[in-house]
């Protein structure tokens, strides 16, 4: 069996970057992936301006006295454009263009207004004090966003500040989702004996929406090999990626691997993690394929650890960053068998001494989904590690925005 890192690397090596692009206005482009380097067409600021309400001064006027007359005012959008006499200052507001020749801006709190209309400064300013120089933030010609960057509520306003109204993005990834199993029933319908609700398809659709994919609901499949084949052929004509849950184990009714081999190719279908050992990755004729385990916890873990980076690559992100890991002190004994990388659900917190502590949230069976609701991290127990005693150090992986 492949390790998690081996499986992840094997997937990402095979996946191509997208080629189809479209131009979108900034509002439509939120959370999409930039398809080219974005070059600033202007300087930001585009002119020297004041960082404070105060007075613009020339240092040469302050060599003999800290008292000056006031020559006029400069407002944002209405700059001072008159002749600037010597031995005088210009009243200026935040963001206003500074008069030509200004060496510094003295904030108004450091100024005394005299009865004769002059002003006196409490101290000699430093050169360039409280001045925002042209191009200080962004210079014309700078690469402000690289190809493969996600367009976020932080980066999009930057583009707006540069006067860029639309951006070239990769086409939204289309992902088809289906569940398999005679025992599954649509959420909201009454259960009969031996039936369970199809939570996996619901879960996967929610996760895909958070990853900003276009979701295609392909419904429920019965445990029938001919139906599997028919559905897989139809799905790959609609989607860039097809995700199934269930049918990837070795039971008599588990047809996913056999059908995938028939109509496409299987790259791998077992990985050394718990939960989530039966995970299939391969390719249909026109779409990539991921087969998640049927157990809800296993499906969520494999989506988080394997499908999430796969989607990032197919969306055009240049590099998927592994989630951060931290050391924590286990506050209770943890059961673990040697042989597989184990992702146990846990809850971490900072104790009174400033140390990170973590506790298990209960039974860790792959069918026990309620523990996820009480969790905020995975307790990551290495493949070669056995049982953990309270007080030992373990690795935790806090949930990112996908599970938040």
Swiss-Prot record:
Annotated catalysed reactions: adenylyl-molybdopterin + molybdate = Mo-molybdopterin + AMP + H(+)
Keyword Transferase (UniProt): yes
Entry's EC annotation: 2.10.1.1
Pfam families: MoCF_biosynth, MoeA_C, MoeA_N
GO MF entry, a single one: molybdopterin molybdotransferase activity
Pathway: Cofactor biosynthesis; molybdopterin biosynthesis
PROSITE patterns to which the protein is assigned, alphabetical: MOCF_BIOSYNTHESIS_2 (PS01079)
Keyword Transferase annotated: yes
Cofactor mode of binding and number, as noted: Binds 1 Mg(2+) ion per subunit.
Cofactors that this protein relies on: Mg(2+)
SUPFAM superfamilies (alphabetical): MoeA C-terminal domain-like, MoeA N-terminal region -like, Molybdenum cofactor biosynthesis proteins
GO terms for biological process, alphabetical: Mo-molybdopterin cofactor biosynthetic process
Database matches in CDD domains: MoeA
GO cellular component terms given for this protein: cytoplasm; cytosol
Keywords: Magnesium, Metal-binding, Molybdenum, Molybdenum cofactor biosynthesis, Transferase
Family indicated by similarity: Belongs to the MoeA family.
Role: Catalyzes the insertion of molybdate into adenylated molybdopterin with the concomitant release of AMP.
Protein name: Molybdopterin molybdenumtransferase
Upper classification of the organism: Bacteria, Pseudomonadati, Pseudomonadota, Gammaproteobacteria, Pasteurellales
Gene responsible for this protein: moeA
């Amino acid at each position: 069996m492949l390790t998690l890192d081996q499986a992840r690397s094997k997937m990402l090596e095979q996946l191509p970057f997208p080629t189809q692009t479209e131009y979108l206005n900034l509002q439509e482009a939120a959370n999409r992936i930039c398809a080219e380097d974005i070059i600033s067409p202007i300087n930001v600021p585009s002119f020297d301006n004041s960082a404070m309400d105060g007075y613009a001064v020339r240092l040469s006027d302050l060599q003999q006295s800290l008292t000056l007359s006031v020559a006029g005012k400069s407002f944002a959008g209405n700059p001072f454009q008159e002749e600037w006499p010597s031995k005088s200052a210009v009243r200026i507001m935040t963001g206003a263009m500074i008069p030509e020749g200004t060496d510094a801006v003295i904030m108004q709190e450091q100024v005394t207004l005299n009865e004769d209309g002059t002003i006196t400064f409490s101290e000699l300013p430093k050169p360039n004090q409280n001045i925002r120089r042209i191009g200080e933030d962004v210079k014309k010609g700078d690469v402000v966003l690289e190809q493969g960057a996600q367009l976020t509520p932080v980066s999009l306003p930057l583009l707006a500040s540069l006067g860029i109204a639309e951006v070239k993005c990769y086409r939204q990834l289309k992902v088809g989702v289906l569940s398999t199993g005679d025992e599954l029933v649509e959420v909201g319908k009454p259960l009969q004996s031996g039936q369970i609700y199809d939570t996996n398809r619901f879960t996967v659709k929610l996760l895909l929406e958070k990853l900003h994919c276009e979701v295609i609901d392909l419904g429920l499949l019965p445990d029938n090999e001919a139906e599997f084949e028919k559905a897989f052929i139809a799905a790959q004509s609609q989607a860039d990626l097809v995700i199934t849950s269930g049918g990837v184990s070795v039971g008599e009714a588990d047809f996913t691997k056999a059908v995938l081999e028939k109509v496409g190719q299987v790259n791998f279908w077992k990985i050394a993690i718990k939960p989530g050992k039966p995970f299939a990755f391969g390719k249909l004729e026109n779409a990539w394929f991921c087969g998640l385990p049927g157990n809800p916890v296993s499906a969520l873990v494999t989506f988080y650890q394997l499908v999430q980076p796969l989607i990032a690559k197919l969306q055009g992100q240049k590099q998927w960053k592994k989630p951060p890991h931290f050391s924590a002190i286990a506050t209770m004994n943890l059961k673990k068998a040697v042989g597989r990388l184990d992702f146990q659900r846990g809850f971490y917190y900072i104790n009174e001494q400033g140390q990170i502590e973590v506790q298990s949230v209960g039974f860790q069976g792959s069918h026990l989904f309620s523990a996820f609701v009480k969790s905020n991290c995975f307790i990551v127990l290495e493949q070669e590690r056995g049982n953990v005693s309270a007080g030992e150090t373990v690795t935790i992986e806090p949930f990112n925005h996908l599970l938040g």
